[in-house]
């Protein structure tokens, strides 16, 4: 059909919202993108083709879903808002390679759902415009699940994207940077201005590209304790590593001796700040803490 207008065009978005009497829920962080060229750029950045299976979160009225469906083998989209299920059934009716799952993605068994939907064992990529209020939990849900995700190309608040891709010694670097970079290689692909959304958010967005590492960035003896340590090291932002560690682990004699011994073994100066430590240094310290842990 030559007169077909893509979902993301401003006029078609308006038409769809009016037809279904849809009103935005602020609590769900709903902002719909109305610029097809940006959506095509997202699909291009993710390298989506007929040998790619895609998981999307929060499809909204299906603007990005449509672009994914045009290029991917199959798409499974998780939508929590029951008001959008009939909208998506309408807007995506021409695409038979899309499955909309009416569920909170954080409660979903990602492996089971994708196994049921995807007919071919193609690489899985996560491509989504993530709701601002729940960006980090959704990302960590995918990273910590046993779903084999080759790549994530997701839109989020620019500030969060900067934190994820941040390098040691920068203001944005923190436990989130480490948690993501442990599993993935991270880079900000491009910026999306706030003016291309309905309703318009208060801040600009960014597309971040995360590529799964063959093995984690560093070798740690206890992954859970490693992440606990990195979180602890940034609790008191402008304090030294020593202040943070004693604040988190305790100041009793045995704990202090354990921390001192481990820091010395890892060759890390306790007067440094957490944001100056690289992933390798955190791994060294985590392994020393694990090795010297009081019985």
UniProtKB/Swiss-Prot annotation:
It holds the Pfam family RrnaAD. Its EC number is 2.1.1.182. GO terms for cellular component: cytosol. InterPro entries: KsgA/Erm (IPR001737), rRNA_Ade_diMease-like_C (IPR023165), rRNA_Ade_Mease_Trfase_CS (IPR020596), rRNA_Ade_methylase_Trfase_N (IPR020598), rRNA_adenine_dimethylase (IPR011530), SAM-dependent_MTases_sf (IPR029063). Keywords: Cytoplasm, Methyltransferase, RNA-binding, rRNA processing, S-adenosyl-L-methionine, Transferase. It is an enzyme of class 2 (transferase). The keyword Cell membrane does not apply. Coiled coil: none annotated. GO terms for molecular function: 16S rRNA (adenine(1518)-N(6)/adenine(1519)-N(6))-dimethyltransferase activity; RNA binding. SMART domains: rADc. It is found in: Cytoplasm. S-adenosyl-L-methionine binds at residues 31, 33, 58, 79, 104, 129. It catalyses: adenosine(1518)/adenosine(1519) in 16S rRNA + 4 S-adenosyl-L-methionine = N(6)-dimethyladenosine(1518)/N(6)-dimethyladenosine(1519) in 16S rRNA + 4 S-adenosyl-L-homocysteine + 4 H(+). Transmembrane segments: none annotated. The keyword Methyltransferase applies. HAMAP family: 16SrRNA_methyltr_A (MF_00607). Belongs to the class I-like SAM-binding methyltransferase superfamily. rRNA adenine N(6)-methyltransferase family. RsmA subfamily. Specifically dimethylates two adjacent adenosines (A1518 and A1519) in the loop of a conserved hairpin near the 3'-end of 16S rRNA in the 30S particle. May play a critical role in biogenesis of 30S subunits. PANTHER family: DIMETHYLADENOSINE TRANSFERASE, DIMETHYLADENOSINE TRANSFERASE-RELATED. NCBIfam families: ksgA (TIGR00755). This is Ribosomal RNA small subunit methyltransferase A. It comes from Enterococcus faecalis (strain ATCC 700802 / V583). The gene is rsmA.
